[in-house]
Amino acid sequence: MFFIINDLKECISALKLKFDDQKELVKLVKNNSFNGFSSTIIFQLKSENHKKIADSIVEWFLKNKKDNYQNVFIANNNFINFQISYQKYLEYLIKTPCFTKKNIKILIESVSANPTGRIHLGHVRIAFFGDVLNNLAKLLGYTTVCEYWVNDYGQQARVFSFSVYQSLQLKKNIAIQQHPDGYSGIVIDKIASEIENFPVDNLNFEEFCKTSFLDHFLVNCTQKVLSLIKSDLNKIHVFIDSWKFESEIVKKTNFNDLLEQLKPNSYFYQDNALWLKTTLYGDDKDRVLIRSDKRASYFGTDVAYHLEKLQRGFDILFNVWGTDHEGHIKRMYCAFDALKNTTKTSLKIFALQLVTLYKNKELVRLSKRAGNVITIETMLSMISEDAARWFMLSQNNGTIIKIDLDIANLQNSANPVYYVQYAFARMNSILRIANSDQLKEITDCSLLINEKEISLLNQLVYYPFMLQKAMETGELHLLTNFLYETASLFHSWYKVCKINDDKNSLLSAQRLALLRSLQFIVKQILDVLKISTPQQM
């Protein structure tokens, strides 16, 4: 599809037309009246004579790009429709998609769950999203780093450590005064049992925070939780390249340098504490960077972290957050614009909604603070990783995921994961029994005239564009949508056409070439999603 966009831009330049290049120029269309690619470019042009302009665009295409198109015409709705030539389709059948290496570095901040417990169901969607975004960017030729931001500096980390300390106090029969936001449960008790020889006194939270051993104790607790978190992520095949600690950023950040970075834009002001003018970006109030006691706020350390990201020379920053951080997004964009000054680094924040599980139409409940969570082990006992990845990535980021476990565990076409995997296995089966002569490289594909075949050829043309769009926008559900649609088209094609026909070797060779290309891209997306690709089912 990129070649259609490029041809259209060349045409617009040749005809000296002006248009809004922020809008999508071309879309894949499948309906009863047309099966191909369509453009609304006419409505984006700064001209009142749409009909005349449309005629000139069609005339230019038919004169200058006839090798690429079987037909270019104006539809009743004034859209310009493109039917691809078989000569162009052939390119997609004899060459597998190849993505050139790009000199662009991407940092993906993902998971970043507070080190106050194990990974739970809500984190899994974020973990899968960051993992797949990382895989996709690598496939497209980008250099990537997937990073976990460890919040080990603030109040929450102290409360968690104190909860471990109180578990030790209880073991030694010391009366405790429970912190109102304290943690309890298996993780707290497990960490306490691993450091049970640590000496404890009758300390309340304020006294605990003033002890000389606080930093050492906090680091110890954090490392033990991170060990559990890494183990959890390994179980779902999510691997982090880099771990950045909030405490380390605070230690090495010269906040005077940070202020110098913000000064040129006059984004901050002093009023007892140091404030950033986040209201400029629609925030309901300005936010504190440095408190009156000179300690950095949670937001302040996050700003320092993003300055450090910029200093490492990344071109694109992707932050994968949960919607519990939604209020943080506007202020982060404000801070980033103030920080980056003349650099061209871009920041994109993806906020992912919650995940819920349903069994027998009833909600499976969870509660992290009470220690009663749906852990990785529990999740994997209820649903396969393949199904979990599919269902958590198959909807818009802002949609609450509601996984019906009864459907997710079905071994039939009602389960979309099974449906796609079965299509892949069936493709393999057909290719496996084809003889070598039938699988030779073809020089023509004009016998592929069935409507399903045209739709599948268009899928091949659309594929590279879809991948790039999914990566840039974070709309990873485009991947699962594409897979399901391709599988559906394939199953329909399989029913109406004999793909491997001994009585028509020429047609069979062309159909098998199409099948081989489809099998390649289906496997490529499943690999990006880290969903298994069974050879037979």
Curated annotation (Swiss-Prot):
Record NCBIfam families: argS
GO cellular component: cytoplasm
Catalyzed reactions per annotation: tRNA(Arg) + L-arginine + ATP = L-arginyl-tRNA(Arg) + AMP + diphosphate
Alphabetical GO biological process terms: arginyl-tRNA aminoacylation
Species in which this protein is naturally found: Mycoplasma genitalium (strain ATCC 33530 / DSM 19775 / NCTC 10195 / G37) (Mycoplasmoides genitalium)
Keywords: Aminoacyl-tRNA synthetase, ATP-binding, Cytoplasm, Ligase, Nucleotide-binding, Protein biosynthesis
Family: Belongs to the class-I aminoacyl-tRNA synthetase family.
Domain of life: Bacteria
Subunit-level organization: Monomer.
Class of enzymatic activity (EC top level): ligase
Keyword Cytoplasm assigned: yes
Keyword Aminoacyl-tRNA synthetase: yes
Enzyme Commission no: 6.1.1.19
Protein name from the UniProt record: Arginine--tRNA ligase
Localization of this protein: Cytoplasm
A GO MF label: arginine-tRNA ligase activity
Motif 'HIGH' region, residue range(s) on this chain: 113-123
